[in-house]
Amino acid sequence: MDVCSWKEMEVALVNFDNSDEIHEEPGYATDFDPTSSKGRPGSSPFSNWRVLISDNTNHETAFSKIPGEYVDPPGPEPVVLNEGNQRVIINIAGLRFETQLRTLNQFPETLLGDREKRMQFFDSMRNEYFFDRNRPSFDGILYYYQSGGKIRRPANVPIDVFADEISFYELGSEAMDQFREDEGFIKDPETLLPTNDFHRQFWLLFEYPESSSAARGVAVVSVLVVVISITIFCLETLPEFREDRELKVVRDPSINTNKTGLSQTMFTDPFFMVESTCIVWFTFELVLRFVVCPSKTDFFKNIMNIIDIISIIPYFATLITELVQETEPSAQQNMSLAILRIIRLVRVFRIFKLSRHSKGLQILGQTLKASMRELGLLIFFLFIGVILFSSAVYFAEVDEPESHFSSIPDGFWWAVVTMTTVGYGDMCPTTPGGKIVGTLCAIAGVLTIALPVPVIVSNFNYFYHRETENEEKPNIPGELDKILNSMGSRMGSTESLNKTNGSCSAEKSRK
């Protein structure tokens, strides 16, 4: 049978096929030559079948449906001169995807990028790779290779299913971390725990109130001590409780020297006794946490620990000052008392110790930290406005004899009060020009403050909703948690993902 007869048979067969179901079959490089050595088409039927199913044929024929064992010789993955441009077929549970080999070779450590790994799934009879996996998920997997490492979950694929596909195709920990971040999994800093079991128990007891009932009890005691300390700090300034603790200078005529004495014995003062009890607890807590902490360097980098240190310094500074000032001259005593008052003022920072046990204060701190740029812009705008309007009101009021603005620095306070819309009224312009400047100052202040406020509020809402969602929403399905946890161990990672209500925390397992 000659070539013309075979082509007539092809036309006849194509006419019987449904044209709607015809798909173009991709061509593959092969060492098979459909022509004879003399350049003429071969006369064997198999050579004609090869011509009919080659990529020069635009329509599928009945011969293209012949099983591969009658057409393609079985063997390993086809090799061509330009392997980078070679097209490969990936069959995902019957859905075929076509891409170039160089696209897959971008990531040689993955399942599809490693030749040895993907050859385990090569079907030599059909000349394609076959994976009995989730079909819609492979859109995102193939996009990872095409985009150079960007992972995107298709909208119609559940999170746990796509996470399992990332694990199966061995895309790596970076792809999994990117997927977690895109899906709203907030990765918290890694939690370090002491290696010693005894130290770990005390560290959890004082550092993590939610770890046990005993830890919650310690947290309650710590909060009560802080509240008592702040209460004592405020009550001792009341007139009915305040005693003159400054030293009285008593002149002794016989020796013509100054002798000093305390208005009352400091060690019998009830406020001092209560304060000492609070300081004992603060010191014990601080020293114990320092001894059992897993990293001494990180301990001093923690702002909460710095606040704890600052909160107990005034007590010991006051105690030392009171004990040594009896031998000092009167002038040095006055200086010591001035320093002592400043040191005592630092005690007010103990209120920040409550943030260790208050989610609200932690959210506020996170908001301020995230909004530092906006707060800096706000202060910068206020600074410009203060300089501008204090100068303007000075020159507007300079000819007024009863003006409150004797200089530009005197107008700083008025500009700040006016721009913040407080308006104490202690200083105000009296001339028409000064009132116009005051009006513009108030309007500029409203606009200046209003501009960065929405960004700060947005940051607060973000941290607030993230925290409330962690407490109110139910846990995610255990299947997803299992997949994500197994992903870390499969990739050789020591991190495990605990996602609760839209957030995740990385905990390092230590021996």
Curated annotation (Swiss-Prot):
Keywords: Ion channel, Ion transport, Lipoprotein, Membrane, Palmitate, Potassium, Potassium channel, Potassium transport, Transmembrane, Transmembrane helix, Transport, Voltage-gated channel. Expressed strongly in the inner ear and weakly in skeletal muscle. Not detected in other tissues. It catalyses: K(+)(in) = K(+)(out). InterPro entries: BTB/POZ_dom (IPR000210), Ion_trans_dom (IPR005821), K_chnl_volt-dep_Kv (IPR003968), K_chnl_volt-dep_Kv1 (IPR003972), SKP1/BTB/POZ_sf (IPR011333), T1-type_BTB (IPR003131), VG_K_chnl (IPR028325), Volt_channel_dom_sf (IPR027359). One of its GO terms (biological process) is protein homooligomerization. It comes from Mus musculus. The keyword Zinc-finger does not apply. The keyword NADP does not apply. The chain crosses the membrane at residues 218-238, 271-292, 303-323, 339-358, 375-395, 436-456. A motif (Selectivity filter) lies at residues 421-426. Homotetramer. Interacts with KCN4B/POMP. Interaction with KCN4B/POMP is necessary for the modulation of channel activity by cAMP. One of its GO terms (cellular component) is voltage-gated potassium channel complex. The channel activity is up-regulated by cAMP. GO terms for molecular function: voltage-gated potassium channel activity. It is found in: Membrane. Voltage-gated potassium ion channel that mediates K(+) permeability of excitable membranes. When opened in response to the voltage difference across the membrane, KCNA10 channel selectively allows the flow of potassium ions across the membrane down their electrochemical gradient. The N-terminus may be important in determining the rate of inactivation of the channel while the tail may play a role in modulation of channel activity and/or targeting of the channel to specific subcellular compartments. Belongs to the potassium channel family. A (Shaker) (TC 1.A.1.2) subfamily. Kv1.8/KCNA10 sub-subfamily. The gene is Kcna10. Disruption phenotype: Viable with no gross defects. Vestibular evoked potentials (VsEPs) are highly abnormal suggesting impaired function of the balance organ, although mice do not display any obvious imbalance behaviors. This is Potassium voltage-gated channel subfamily A member 10. The lineage of its organism: Eukaryota, Metazoa, Chordata, Craniata, Vertebrata.
